Amino acid sequence: MQSSLRIFSGILALSLSGSLYALPECPSGPSEKWHNCFGTFSIDGDKYFGEYKEGKQHGQGTYTRADGEKYVGEFKEDKMHGQGTYTRADGEKYVGEWKEDKMHGQGTYTRADGGKYVGEFNENKMHGQGTYTFADGKKYFGELKEGKNHGQGTYTFADGRKYVGEWKEGLYHGQGTYSFADGRVFRGHYMNNQYVPSICQDMGLTKGTEAFGQCVLKLIDEITKDN
């Protein structure tokens, strides 16, 4: 029985190592000459273990930085490229697609405080369609541009409040509906996070007057041109 277990363990170890790297081990000598093999390279406390092609990190590999940060995944010509996982020293983690050392494509970024973004990235920034769930319970689902809520989106607060509508550079801007937990609803146009009728009232104009109506129409026109 013990003999059978030893044989099984040996087969398992061989199959695992074979599944990790199908290429042969790189020969001794400068890494610039390594080709179609896997090897280990260290410099200034950083360490790479993985596949090489024409002297460059290319294929599957693991790169561990001296500060403890680590990338495990695909490489292309010495750059993180393809599917991979990057774990920061503070615990933050990105799992998803990479392009030339940048988060690019579909991915999931988890912050150290528990906040999480799942969606599209463009050159290291949240960009496209995505969902961001905050550690305190708030949630945004919709379009983003260069890391900010931009376009159509829904923002839900932990206390039940909700905004559904247009955004611009992280602010309510355009057509939208703001619902309160007590049932009140402000539906209409927003400008830089403010409800348009409220802006006119703050200017001292009385709701229902001609001046108030002109103020509202003017701001809506500005918003329309701005978008």
Please give the residue ranges for each predicted region.
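Bacterial N-terminal signal peptides that target proteins for export
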Residues: M1-S9
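Glycine/tyrosine- and acidic-biased, solvent-exposed loop/turn segments at the edges of beta-strands
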Residues: L20-N227
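Bacterial N-terminal signal peptides
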Residues: S9-S17
